[in-house]
Amino acid sequence: MRIFNLEEPLIYSYFRSGFYSFISRDMVLLQKITDRSGVCLKVFFNPLIGDIKDYNWGHPFLVASNNMAPRSERARLIDAVIIQNLCAWHGLAPRVYEIVGLSWEGKIYPALIVDDLGEASDMVEWDQRVKIMEAIKKIGDKYGFYTEYEDLGQARNFIKDKFVDFQAFKLKPDYRDQVIKRYKAKAKWSENTYQTVPELGIGGYRDNERRLELMQLNKLDFTGKSVLDIGCSGGFYCRYAKDRGASRVLGVDLQNVADAAFEVSNYLGYYDINYSGMKLEPNLDYNFGFSIDIIFYLSVYRYFGYAPFLKKAKMIIYEHNGDVPEEEAIKQFSKDFPKHWEVAITGRDTGSNDDRRTLIFAKE
């Protein structure tokens, strides 16, 4: 978690804040923390004690247990963020991009960088609140989260047809297992799980940790770069780019695959990686909405050729499919993109029966 020192206390409206958090739109602080537009900070009143993984959002809610004895429940902040982003993926909540810490007078206060929906209103109709909550509960049934306290009485928790207060939501005990199961079912190539997810013990057709070593990507600088991964599969290289300091990352694949990549990344805490489910057509140009520094173009040439949008990148990390000799791949790329020069990085990619050499094409 990144920590930022406050130079002065944040100002908030007592009448517009919640019991446990408030919204800050302090532009000086936001510009210090993020380059994203259209976001605000949701700052929590209770300081952090111990690990952020153990930080709870809000107060305990009394709910009935199976033996009719009441018990208290409240959500861990990181679980609530996972749930909120699952709802955001379906258009039912503002998206959380990062959990940061704000340091003031020796204490650290957790805060969320989140989509700014504007001011809340007390005029949201009851039927509309019920409609939104029912949609969220269906999403919970699909993924594996729940609430026993819907809090429909607070109209201000519903802004622009989205719900903003997930302090009473919890993940089901088997959620991790369900994430793994869904990933294996969706992030596939042929009949195989394609990319490994070491953090979850998921193996795959391509040993990505070994591939990183062979591709020698550690020699490249990702700091502050915007990265596009075409055919991102399970999002392994998207997460790698973020770990290496990339400022913005977008992974593109078929919708079902993008769903799996998003859920795994969200569960692992990579909240700010964007995923897009779309079917790219060969020889068509696409505007991905941002200036691209680096494109991962791994084993997708046979589907798209040298797509026109590759020209927009400053660097292309390219792996051919093994169906053409390396020299032919370089020759064809040089013909299509004469303003580029190439550096070959040698090595055999595991999981393949051929030598697939990864090439770096970089603009002069």
Segments (PLM) and residue ranges:
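Conserved HxN/HPN-centered segment at the entrance to the catalytic loop
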Residues: 89-99
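Conserved structural core of kinase catalytic domains
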Residues: 97-132
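Conserved kinase catalytic-core helix
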Residues: 83-91, 120-162
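ATP-binding glycine-rich loop module of kinase domains
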Residues: 29-77
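ATP-binding glycine-rich phosphate-binding loop
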Residues: 3-35, 43-45
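Catalytic activation segment of kinase domains across protein kinase-like and atypical kinase folds
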Residues: 150-182
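Conserved alpha-helix/loop element of class I SAM-dependent methyltransferases that forms part
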Residues: 205-222
